[in-house]
Amino acid sequence: MKETDSLTCSDLRPARKAPQTAIGQVLIEALPYIRKFERKTFVIKYGGSAMKDLCLKNSFAQNVTLLRKVGINVVLVHGGGDAITKTAEKLGITSTFVHGKRVTDKEMISVVQMTLAGKVNQDIVQLISEHGGKAVGVTGLDADTIQAVPCRDAATLGLVGEIESINTAYIDLLCKAGLIPVIAPIGFDDDGNIYNINADDAASSIAIALKAEKLIYVSDVAGIQVGERILKTICKAEAADFIEQGIITGGMIPKVLSGFLTLDGGVRKIHIIDGKSVHSLLLEIFTHEGVGTQFISEQDDESNH
């Protein structure tokens, strides 16, 4: 697939007409997965370059709409860190980060809320609508969806929260109505304080609470890479070895650890896919080979799905 900087909207359409037999084979290959996942719940964490490039955004919205149309309950949790930083700059507010986390005072939490709920969330809802889907914007404040407590580093980070509980009632209601909940990761506590929540953590907690079939991270990497190879599957023991050997490093470490905690919480499969590749979501779900890395509970479970 082409990288984001060389992608054009024409890449969302075939350059030439594919042979009818090839089209038929793709559809037949997808059929057992469509049957298998009907009425199942997928939580998708949407972030990275896939949220910035217009053509990638359209591709993602098409993919999500198709998943919903074939009977899969799709729940989106989105980030928006770059958008928050840009909004803050326009308002003359400086963004400060400690160990990759945004320091969030009362002024900054207003920017977070305004940007995630008022801009990023609604843009995603609108784009899905343009492609024939029916989405509803949600924040963790709606129907007590994300209840939070101050994070352990609150003295330094301010209004950055850790998730205490997820109320799934509203999300379930939307899914049963055939809608796609699009969730901005903002939480609250019993005193009415609003918190900035890490989107990966929110997606993980929501997937566990919903007893989801899958949690899918749409990221800026094609999966977990060892040498020149993208791993199709990885188990917990392998991940621990790769972290110890320095093969898995940096920001991938917390994502991998969070993924296995999510597996332990009852979610059946965790996937990391490349948001810079057009239609990677459909290719991961509906083809035998897949295109990303999935986390598995057992080392001998080589099934792509």
Swiss-Prot record:
Its EC number is 2.7.2.8. This is Acetylglutamate kinase. It is an enzyme of class 2 (transferase). The gene is argB. Pathway: Amino-acid biosynthesis; L-arginine biosynthesis; N(2)-acetyl-L-ornithine from L-glutamate: step 2/4. It catalyses: N-acetyl-L-glutamate + ATP = N-acetyl-L-glutamyl 5-phosphate + ADP. NCBIfam families: argB. It is found in: Cytoplasm. It comes from Chlorobium luteolum (strain DSM 273 / BCRC 81028 / 2530). It comes from the Bacteria.
